[in-house]
Design a protein with these regions (language model features):
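Flavin (FAD/FMN) cofactor-binding and adjacent substrate-gating region
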Residues: 1-45, 50-59, 64, 178, ...
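Structural motif
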Residues: 13-14, 75, 140-141, 208-210
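Short, surface-exposed beta-strand/loop "edge" segments at domain boundaries and coil↔beta transitions
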Residues: 21-24, 70-72, 218-220
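C-terminal catalytic lobe of FAD-dependent flavoproteins
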Residues: 31, 128, 137-138, 149, ...
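Hydrophobic/aromatic beta-strand patches that form the interior of the parallel beta-sheet core
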Residues: 44, 77, 210-212
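Flavin-dependent oxidoreductases
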Residues: 52-161, 168, 174-177
Length: 244
């Protein structure tokens, strides 16, 4: 209580992680994309993959887009989020099954930003880490997410029931959460794979096809390490050398 006076009196014990931290996920993503661009990556936005095929004669992959464009590659990295199973299952007999799991958040005004000074987690359950209450790098307060399994892989809308659940569950940790200071709300989809874990690496029966699938929480924290690991795998596969 000395560290977090706003915590509920019903809290019996806590685990403090002094090395934990926060980032802005939007700015982090943009920064990584900028770094990729500097290193030669070319982005193709709004370019859906229609089909994948492997040419055994030269080991190359052929990618056909929904617009009819084609690409040829020696390796493919499958980081397609909730659609990663659909791409993987085109090329591998070991099937993946990804369920979109919606999480809804509420963002509170900076007037509530000092209510807590750490990211407050509840005990995790089978659907994830539960509702958290966290400061943001911009001085706001973030509450969420919910966890709702869906069939629609584009359902990123918020719901009245979901947002009510965010505030109700958040107040189990911090009873004084001021819902009237909510300035916006949003939702996203985690890619929850049936096996319950990340799927990272080269598909055994699809040489040159590398999965980064089923990356749900703590995917943001894991992303830099996953990126470095997969880069090493691909570099080894291509016998590539470091750039000067």
């Amino acid at each position: 209580k000395s560290l977090e006076p706003a915590l509920s009196d019903d809290v019996k014990a806590v685990l403090v992680c002094p090395t934990g931290g926060i980032v802005c996920p939007f700015l982090m993503t943009i920064a990584l994309a900028e770094n990729a661009a500097v290193n030669g990556v070319s982005f193709r936005f709004d370019t859906a993959v229609k089909s994948l095929s492997h040419d055994a004669s030269d080991g190359h992959w052929n990618v056909l887009t929904a617009a009819g464009d084609t690409f040829e590659a020696r390796c493919i990295i499958n980081a397609a989020g909730v659609y990663a199973d659909e791409l993987h299952n085109q090329v591998s007999a070991r099937k993946l099954s990804i369920t979109p799991r919606r999480g809804e958040y509420q963002l509170l005004d900076k007037k509530a930003g000092t209510l807590v000074s750490h990211t407050i987690f509840q005990l995790p359950g089978k659907m994830g880490k539960g509702i958290l209450v966290s400061p943001t790098v911009h001085g706001n307060l973030l509450v969420g997410p919910t966890a709702e399994n869906l069939s629609d892989k584009e359902a990123v809308n918020t719901t009245q029931a979901g947002l009510a659940d965010v505030m109700e569950k958040g107040r189990l940790s911090v009873p004084s959460l001021p819902g009237n200071l909510t300035i916006t709300s949003f939702a996203g989809l985690r890619a929850s794979e049936a096996g319950g874990d990340f799927v990272i690496g080269e598909a055994e029966d699809a040489p040159g096809f590398f999965d980064c699938a089923g990356i749900e929480s703590p995917g943001l924290s894991s992303a830099p390490a996953i990126g470095e690991y997969v880069a090493e795998l691909v570099s080894h596969k291509l016998e590539a050398s470091c750039k000067d």
